[in-house]
């Protein structure tokens, strides 16, 4: 669908005044330090190299945009233009360390305008400002004692999920099921919604949001971007209904002040004694639900893919998980101690995250002029770090395309080289939460089934996460009792 709009947008660009291009780049792209700008090109006026950046992902090779330019310019920093902004790509562990270490000093988080349009704030603040506020609210729900409580909740939901979606099926589509699993957990943990029909009503528009949040920003009927904007409003309206009902339930003593993040938001004031409005809370819950299931659903899907392709790896995971399963009494839930025993399984999951990182990279914005590696970076430039620049680098990970969980034994990879969750102050606060979801999923799927891929050479597309083009259909072989 996105490729259909490439010629449409290109025709539009032909009518954009070139004077804007020269004004924009002459005023914002020049070096003021005497040092040269990084090597590279800025592509077409206004749209820059955005189509090349996005289309390599649509074709299943997101790393190609990065590695082609690294080879061409022989530099770990190169200039480009993405989403209408002058930009520089920072590639490699040293670059990651520099960006992550200078958060809120030389650089700050930045999202394309499309993100703010899909997630408009009721308070007219940016997605970046909302994210900062959200990080202040999350620690109580992501600290170890809280995470320990979630293991049993995730185990219960996983049992229901596999019973309804996998058992007594000859074939299943893994990616939609993985999204259902992680979204079900997010709904339960964040807003105490767990009834399957309610979860399904929220999940459908969320799928449209995920497909359009980082897309060609054409707000016309039928485009992914337009669908994402409409779906965001639908979800927000549904959340407003949930929030209003919770306020009533709290007032009548029918809900607990500590049962989930929603209750906490309703009852917690800021440093000035001001409470969040219902609209504020809906905005934040919307962002949490997106972040709380997308990363893990992609990871769970690729766990199934790689275990189907690598029977020796499957056997290692199966052995570890069955030892845990056999130690449990009938009906006994998984607990924190069980999770800590899943060492090989987590090494496997980490290797999956290395080869198919859900977070392909992220943007920063230069807060001031600065220099790096002999190049000038002007204030306002957007800076993109890429997970694949280290994950698939043979100098960091020998034989980078080989699946090898032993890379994560002992001390593991060098610092700043394995970055599926980002790094520094902006490292995903839900990293440990996602780890629990993934490991609970692995426990349930391998103790029930072996499987094989229905489409051996199924294409992978990245938009913005890696996704099997056909949803990863697999043929199930239940274990004999």
From Swiss-Prot:
Signal peptide limits: none
Subcellular localization(s) per the UniProt record: Membrane
UniProt entry tagged with the keyword Calcium: no
EC number: 1.14.14.126
Principal location: membrane
An annotated Gene Ontology molecular function: iron ion binding
Pfam families listed in its UniProt record: p450
Keywords: Heme, Iron, Membrane, Metal-binding, Monooxygenase, Oxidoreductase, Transmembrane, Transmembrane helix
Disulfide bridge map: none
Superkingdom assignment: Eukaryota
Bilayer topology: Single-pass membrane protein
Family: Belongs to the cytochrome P450 family.
UniProt protein name: Beta-amyrin 28-monooxygenase
Species assigned in the record: Kalopanax septemlobus
Taxonomy of the source species: Eukaryota, Viridiplantae, Streptophyta, Embryophyta, Tracheophyta
